[in-house]
From Swiss-Prot:
Region (Actin-binding): 573-595
CDD domains: MYSc_Myo1 (cd01378)
Gene field: MYO1G
Protein name: Unconventional myosin-Ig
Main subcellular location: membrane
Organism expressing this protein natively: Gallus gallus
Amino acid sequence: MTELEGPEFGKADFVLLDEVTMEHFMENLRLRFSKGRIYTYIGEVVVAMNPYQPLELYGPSVVEQYRGRELYERPPHLFALADAAYKAMKRRAKDTCIVISGESGAGKTEASKYIMQYIAAITNPTQRAEVERVKNGLLKSNCVLEAFGNAKTNRNDNSSRFGKYMDINFDFKGDPTGGHIYNYLLEKSRVLQQQPGERNFHSFYQLLLGAPDALLASLHLQRDPTAYCYTQQGTQGSAGGDDARGYRAVEEAMAVIGFTPEEVGAVQRILAAILHLGNVQFVAEGEVAALEAVEQLAVLAQLTGTTPEQLRQALLARTVATGGGELIEKGHSPTEAAYGRDACAKAIYERLFGWIVGRINASITARGYDVRQHGKSTVIGVLDIYGFEIFDTNSFEQFCINYCNEKLQQLFIELILRQEQAEYQREGITWQNIEYFSNEPIVELVEQPHRGILALLDEACLAVGTVTDALFLANMDARLGHHPHYSSRKLCPTDKTMEFDRDFRIKHYAGDVTYSVEGFLDKNKDTLFQDFKRLLYNSMDPVLRAMWPDGEQSITEVTKRPLTAATLFKNSIVALVENLASKEPYYVRCIKPNDQKSPVLFDEERCRHQVAYLGLLENVRVLRAGFAYRQPYDRFLQRYKMTCEYTWPNHLMATDREATQTLLEQHGFQDDVAYGHTKVFIRTPRTLFCLEQERAQLIPIIVLLLQKAWRGALARRWCRYLRAAYAIMGYYKRHKVKAYLLELIRRFQGVRSMPDFGKSLAWPEPPAVLSRFQENSQQLFRRWRARQIVKNIPPSDMAQIRAKVAAMGALHGLRKDWGCQRGWVRDYLSSASENPGLALPFAHRVQALRDKVHFGAVLFSSHVRKINRFNKSRDRAILITDQHLYKLEPRKQYRVMRELPLSMVTGLSVTSCRAQLVVFHTQNHDDLAVCLHKTQPRGDERVGELVGVLLEHCRTTKRELQVHVSDRIQLSLRGRKRLLTVETQPDVAAPDFRKSRDGFVLYWPGS
């Protein structure tokens, strides 16, 4: 927190100075710089000193310290300002902007990058992919734009040679959804010429010193900037491999932004073409120019996607259309050809830079943004524009740059100083007027219609006849000589710092600047022969061709005179200032501590001069006498009314002013506020922070209240919908049910008299609600129909019917035949026809057993063939009563050989073929395997009868009996596991058991 900074660091806010004088201001600035405190506040303005060294002030931990904090809660920092602009945008849904100003080399570009870094770090907590794409594009765009738009100057190693304003769009949650970059006045003359100690744009050196050897070979380039006219001036490549690292960083950034490999290759070819174009030299051949080295054309043609002949024609001549539409080809002199070559190189680089900016904008623009879905879109603008420049030789570019800085200073004065004081007067707030320097006369000197320097420059460019730069200067001397901020050698003959017919001086807010008028007219006209435009429009390279849409015009087409460079720049700056004025501004005022780029040297005079012309002292005085925050009463209440019981949810007082006064007095802030006619003014940010804290505590409660009310309304509405839907559904269901039942009655009303009792009738398709009803009805109908059929069966046959039903349930679909179609006798051994000669002995044996164990009934009896303990087949008989299973010896008066309680039988196994094999599984693991034998007629199917009889008996005794159907039966004989299979043998007369490797095989006679 700022109050935790000890007195040894000075005042963290210049507003807290004991005395507001230049001496005290400079003393505090010097002290903080010497202690490594490069940021200091003036209220909500950040004064930033360029440290000229890396500082550990921008890592993730520092970001977390400033996230969501108020300005005064942490030491001064760019992050605090960025967070304040972000919070203001979110809280009030109002567009904000951050204006970064200062002279060249003061650290504006670095400040803009740190602000972008902070905004990217605190947004998109849910890591949405689209938001991450936009953030990465915004961050990486800086790297690309610096490479193509920045250069080393004598004052700054990474000087922005263009102006940049970036709009970042946010959704209602505060996540970035897109952005747009505006660029202003690229210093394209730097492509041709640089002052001693300076360099061309970084992009050329990065390509020459960082590209792989194979790429350089394909572009016909040498790894030597001194080999090319456009890069051999001034100083050369940076030490330490900075250009090589920059090349790799730019390639990576372009890939992240979305440049395709083809587009990157086209950019590299265009840069190489500019370098080669600069090496094209001309010689006189009679009255016209000729190429010094014709072989260069082949390389240029390859790089630009044109032909050598087309290039030669465009470089050495131009086509002029007469008034009658006749075309005349006019050859260039060597001087004219060199001028055309340089104009073409400048224009190509300018169009390339504009195309790159447009390509970045296409990548970061908001996609699919729907206001109804995402809410209102708000914007944070970040302005990083060239600083005030005073060089040894100042030309047209410095004139435009300094004019831009005058306009921004005018905006600062208008918003911070003039409007601030005017608002206090308008609102009736007691106020002590603060004097300040107004640069409005300087701005008017430059841009005033018909009388300003820009108007006179355009007038000279449009004049008929030969007009030179010296004539333009003479016209300015005549028209502007009386202006207090303008002078020249002619007006001040004793001032030998200026040359006659060359120099003029403007007393800017930041100091006096002497401009050389040489080249003003030419740079303002920005002439480029139409032949070059047509040449590049017809290029085979789609990227290069897209940069020259104006080359499509016919040679004879009459077009309007294009606006001059100065007019275009003025219009763009006026639009920029209007855009900034519509937003809530936040300022970063960058100060350059020295010209030696030293991290320890504090140049008192240089810093004092910057503080003076930036108006920082006046800014302190205005804030000391004024208020940090103001808001119309209705908007103030709208935001904070929930913090006071008398204003929530709506006040009953006469005016909003009374309600605001009541709210602030309840919190005890009456001594820190003033009440205007339409607005409330709050002096310190701490008061506002306290209100915000209380509001933040109450918002969740209000949200819950609103959620409860809204959810209740939604639930009630949904309930009404449901009731209506259920009513409709109920009526419709009743209609469908009624129709179904009527149709069902109609179809089945005569079913009792039908021969099949309705078996052949089709049931109507039921509605979904009656599907279960139909299933139950069909089941009841089947039972009713079965009862109708069964009631005609004699009671004596019912036992047989039940047994057959039980057998069908166990064997139907599993065994080919189970004797359903014949009558079941059960006790076959008591039949004289089935058991001739032995029926009587069997009857005696049955009677003896009945007398002994008193069983109730004989369930089944039959001759069988079985396996004995010696694994031999033997003829036996079985008798099954309701209590026991008996194995009998027929040849010995049916003597009982084995008696097995029926309760010991756990299951039966039969085969799927016609073999009459039955295995009785027992609890004691001594199973009985028999084959029904000696049936009359021969081969009669009785397995199904045996199964059905036993199942029906178990059903009546409520005991479960498992029935298995398989052609490979597992059984246990005296505790040992055996496998029993069946084979059909045509040559076997009677069934017979044989031993096999795994157990036994039953050979069944074939048919």
